[in-house]
C-alpha cells in the first residue's frame, strides 16, 4: 500500500462521506461546497536510515488540505478525530495551520484547514 492510499484509508475510516483526492480535485466536483473534500499532495520524499552502504528507509511528508462542507459542524472535534486516527497508523502531525475562509468564493465561503503529516517507512514496509 502506498502512503497516499494509507492516508485515504485512514480518512475514510473515520469520515466515510468525505471525498479524498490525490494531487488535484477534479473539475466536475471542485465547486461542490456541500461535501467535505480532502486534497492530498506530497510535501516531502527523502531517503534515510542508511546501513550496509545503502538506504533502508524513506521519509514521506504530505499536506492535507481540508475543504469543509458548508454544513460541517464541530470542526475541532473532527480534526481531533482525524489526528488520532492518523497517529494510530504512526503518522505524525507536524503542522496544523489555522482554519481560514476561502474568500475567492462569493456565493458561499468554505472553511479550509491545512495539515502536514510525516512518516518514515522501511523499504520492507513499502513492499520493495
Map each language-model feature to its residues.
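Small/polar-rich, solvent-exposed N-terminal microdomains that initiate assembly or binding
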Residues: 1-50
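Amphipathic alpha-helical segments
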Residues: 4-16, 78-91
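Intrinsically disordered, low-complexity coil segments
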Residues: 26-33, 72-77, 104-105
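Short, cysteine-centered beta-strand-loop-beta hairpins and adjacent loop/turn segments enriched
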Residues: 47-48, 70-74, 123-127
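Short, solvent-exposed beta-strand/turn "edge" segments of beta-rich domains on protein surfaces
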Residues: 50-56, 106
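Oligomerization/assembly interface segments of phage tail-like spikes and tubes
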Residues: 56-70, 109-121
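Mid-chain, well-packed structural core segment of small domains
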Residues: 58-88
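Acidic-leaning, charged glycine-interspersed low-complexity segments
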Residues: 79-128
Amino acid at each position: 500500500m502506498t502512503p497516499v492510499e494509507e492516508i485515504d484509508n485512514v480518512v475514510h475510516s473515520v469520515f466515510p462521506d468525505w471525498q479524498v483526492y490525490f494531487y488535484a480535485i477534479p473539475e466536475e466536483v471542485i465547486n461542490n461546497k456541500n461535501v467535505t473534500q480532502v486534497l492530498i499532495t506530497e510535501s516531502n520524499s527523502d531517503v534515510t536510515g542508511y546501513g550496509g552502504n545503502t538506504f533502508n528507509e524513506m521519509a514521506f511528508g504530505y499536506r492535507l488540505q481540508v475543504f469543509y462542507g458548508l454544513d460541517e459542524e464541530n470542526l475541532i472535534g473532527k480534526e481531533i478525530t482525524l489526528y488520532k486516527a492518523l497517529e494510530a497508523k504512526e503518522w505524525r502531525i507536524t503542522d496544523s495551520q489555522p482554519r481560514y475562509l476561502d474568500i475567492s468564493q462569493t456565493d458561499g465561503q468554505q472553511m479550509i484547514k491545512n495539515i502536514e503529516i510525516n512518516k518514515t517507512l522501511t523499504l520492507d514496509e513499502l513492499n520493495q
